[in-house]
C-alpha cells in the first residue's frame, strides 16, 4: 500500500479507509518511538505523582487499545475478550485521576475572607445621632 496502484485483493470502496488506517498506524508508530526514546525512569523522575499516574494510565490504555485493534484484525470480537474489561478498569482509574485534578483546580472557600466581604458589603451601622433623634421624636408624640 505504500504508494502503489490500487490492489486487486480488496474492494475499491475501502481503499480510502485503508490509506487512512495506514497513516494512523504510522502516526502511532512515530509517537511510540518518541515515547520510548526516553527511559521510563527518567520520564517519571521529572513528574509529580499525579502526572506519573496519568502517564501510566495513558500507556496502559494505549497498549490495550492497540491489542483491541489487533484482535479485530484477526477476526476475534474484542467485545467478548477480557481486554474489554481491562479497558473499562483503566477508564475508571482515568476518571478518578480526572476528579482529583478537578478538585485541585477548584476554588477553595476562605471563610474568614467571605465573612468579612459580606459584613463590609451589606452591614452599615446606624449613626448614633440618628437613633437618639428618632427616639426623641417618638417620645414627644
Curated annotation (Swiss-Prot):
It is found in: Nucleus; Cytoplasm; Nucleus, Nucleolus. Phosphorylated by PRKDC. One of its GO terms (biological process) is regulation of gene expression. GO terms for molecular function: DNA binding; RNA binding. GO terms for cellular component: cytoplasm; exosome (RNase complex); nucleolus. Residues 100-141 are annotated as: Interaction with NCOR1 and NCOR2. Residues 50-100 are annotated as: Interaction with NR1D1. There is a cross-link at residues 119, 126, 132 (Glycyl lysine isopeptide (Lys-Gly) (interchain with G-Cter in SUMO2)). Keywords: Apoptosis, Cytoplasm, DNA-binding, Isopeptide bond, Nucleus, Phosphoprotein, Repressor, RNA-binding, rRNA processing, Transcription, Transcription regulation, Ubl conjugation. Pfam families: Sas10_Utp3. Its main location: nucleus. Residues 1-100 are annotated as: Required for transcriptional repression. Plays a role in the recruitment of the RNA exosome complex to pre-rRNA to mediate the 3'-5' end processing of the 5.8S rRNA; this function may include MPHOSPH6. Can activate PRKDC not only in the presence of linear DNA but also in the presence of supercoiled DNA. Can induce apoptosis in a p53/TP53 dependent manner. May regulate the TRAX/TSN complex formation. Potentiates transcriptional repression by NR1D1 and THRB. Monomer and homodimer. Interacts with NR1D1, THRA, THRB, NCOR1 and NCOR2. Associates with the RNA exosome complex. Interacts with EXOSC10; the interaction probably mediates the association with the nuclear form of the RNA exosome. The homodimeric form interacts with TSNAX following gamma-radiation. Interacts with RAC3. Belongs to the C1D family. This is Nuclear nucleic acid-binding protein C1D. It comes from Bos taurus. The gene is C1D.
